[in-house]
Amino acid sequence: MTRKQMELLDFIKTRMDRDGVPPSFDEMKDALDLRSKSGIHRLITALEERGFIRRLAHRARAIEIVKLPEAMERAGFSARAAKAAAAPLPKGAVTVETAGALDLPLMGRIAAGLPIEAINGGPQSVTVPGMMLSGRGQHYALEVKGDSMIAAGINDGDIVVIREQQTADNGDIVVALVADHEATLKRYRRRGGMIALEPANDSYETQVYPEQMVKVQGRLVGLIRSY
């Protein structure tokens, strides 16, 4: 097993253990510092051929860990069949009623111009599937206003579930507070001493700020959409 294969398998199992779903190919590429996703495809194929993982057809982010190298087993990780759930449309969706529903505070809309503290809408709450929550830390919900993240599957009017935290990994979608007065939902990238907040819509430009101007307020862990 090559070093890169080991690194990728370790990253996949760490993210699945933390989030319950595999990372995206973009997240894998960034984690391994590769220039393109083709390298990730080759590593995934090699891991599958060696029997460490299994890809499930016609499902987004559908990777199942089958076994681990002895070195990882000795480190204390128990290989488990952790995989993304599938449903007709959208992929991975579940009904609130079947997922151990919990109430979270709905703090308002995530839109440019207001920090999280200022958009607290009072005692409103929203019911979310318990499986979205990590079991540790505080969570809250926000209503999305705008279309800057549509390519990431986040639409205007969606409810996003956020886990409160002050740090983020490259590629995470976060609530970021800029210059202590503007909150935004964007993909987080560290570039040396700068922080890039990337939209998922070509109509918007990436925002780049000095590190000290950006405070992570939380990380996206789930999304709720009404039809």
Curated annotation (Swiss-Prot):
EC identifiers of the protein: 3.4.21.88
Subunit field text: Homodimer.
The keyword Hydrolase is annotated on this UniProt entry: yes
InterPro entries, per the entry: LexA, LexA-like, LexA/Signal_pep-like_sf, LexA_DNA-bd_dom, LexA_repressor, Peptidase_S24_LexA, Peptidase_S24_S26A/B/C, WH-like_DNA-bd_sf
Protein known as: LexA repressor
Entry keywords, A to Z: Autocatalytic cleavage, DNA damage, DNA repair, DNA replication, DNA-binding, Hydrolase, Repressor, SOS response, Transcription, Transcription regulation
Catalytic residues (UniProt): 148 (for autocatalytic cleavage activity), 186 (for autocatalytic cleavage activity)
GO terms, molecular function: DNA binding; serine-type endopeptidase activity
UniProt family annotation: Belongs to the peptidase S24 family.
Lineage: Bacteria, Pseudomonadati, Pseudomonadota, Alphaproteobacteria, Rhodobacterales
DNA-binding region(s) in UniProt: 25-45
Residues under site feature: Cleavage: 112-113
Purpose: Represses a number of genes involved in the response to DNA damage (SOS response), including recA and lexA. In the presence of single-stranded DNA, RecA interacts with LexA causing an autocatalytic cleavage which disrupts the DNA-binding part of LexA, leading to derepression of the SOS regulon and eventually DNA repair.
Any one of the GO BP annotations: DNA repair
Protein origin, superkingdom: Bacteria
Gene: lexA
NCBIfam families given in the database record: lexA
Catalytic activity as recorded in UniProt: Hydrolysis of Ala-|-Gly bond in repressor LexA
